[in-house]
UniProtKB/Swiss-Prot annotation:
Enzyme class at the top of the EC tree: transferase
Catalysed reaction, written as an equation: 2 ATP = 3',3'-c-di-AMP + 2 diphosphate
Full protein name: DNA integrity scanning protein DisA
BP GO annotations: DNA repair
EC number: 2.7.7.85
PROSITE patterns given in the database record: DAC (PS51794)
Residues annotated as domain DAC: 11-149
Quaternary assembly: Homooctamer.
Entry superkingdom: Bacteria
InterPro entries given in the database record: DisA, DisA_sf, DNA_integrity_DisA_N_sf, DNA_integrity_scan_DisA_link, DNA_integrity_scan_DisA_N, DNA_integrity_scanning_protein, RuvA_2-like
Assigned keywords, A-Z: ATP-binding, DNA damage, DNA repair, DNA-binding, Magnesium, Nucleotide-binding, Nucleotidyltransferase, Transferase
Amino acid sequence: MSTTTDILPDVHTMRDTLQRLAPGTPLRDGLDRIVRGHTGALIVLGDEENVTSICDGGFEFDVTFAATRLRELCKMDGAVVLSSDGERIKRANVQLIPSPSWPTQESGTRHRSAERTALQTGVPVIAVSESQNTITLYVEGKSHILEEPSTLLNRANQALGTMERYRDRLDQVNTRLHMAELHNYATVIDVVSVIQREEMLRRVGETIDTNVLELGREAKQIQIQLTELRGDNDRERGYIIADYLVTDGIPTDETITEALEAVSGLDDKSLMKPSNIARILGLPPTEEALDEPVVPRGYRTLNRVPRVQKFLMDKLVGEFGNLHALTSASVEEISAVDGVGSLWARHITDGLARLT
């Protein structure tokens, strides 16, 4: 059975901290009690030496964390310091004295202190606003306001609707490209359209991931739908790059990753310009070139044949060079490839035949 300590990261991140603050967790219960009580709070999620060095006054103790204890201790003006695993309350009513040289965009005293403490120590800090009844998390140099579960659920459901439309459109362009590949009439714009839709699906899925983290156990149904809509998109993104990235020989994992990161680095407007995707692939980025024919190496199609692993795909692509040569090869020619053998050769040729 895992404990809170088991999931603690070596470096505090927004993602991990949001998971610790999800509805239903003891810490979120304590924060919700503070909000309902209309009192402010300043809570530090860690008692490392760089935290204790900026603590002044208050009192030290070491008691088991409880939501009710946190609520009562936060009635005092000072900050509350928890252990790094959040299991114990270490200090209360302390004044935090971070360096004023740290930049902050906050106006309230409590929030300015929270942001500067998080920046200086690298430890997550929470500020609860007494006047606005909001919970703000500071970590990784960023701030994030925790929202009500009902608000998050509505947003996640809206995003799922968007993702469903993206999935439908991706399936359409994917099918069109698949048929074009098999019948030797694929063009640059066919490839670009699939990459664009795959990236759009990835982005909206990433947004929903954050909602799922914040919702915690209340996101079970959202997670099921997200997994279904996402499908094999991450793997397929890599295979289409492997099929069409212009390189000498077979693309390496490193070059594929670089191309994927370049696509992910485009803003939404730039993503919708086909020339930008073509340029990343190493293809001519002109409008005229978008209708030029392209020939896949065969990774996407081989991925549709059950149980064919990436290392086997590399061997086949390395031997035959492209999908057309591969689909034209006999069982004997495929079985002659090092590491394939007759059983796999028959399985692969039968699988390719069914796809065509």
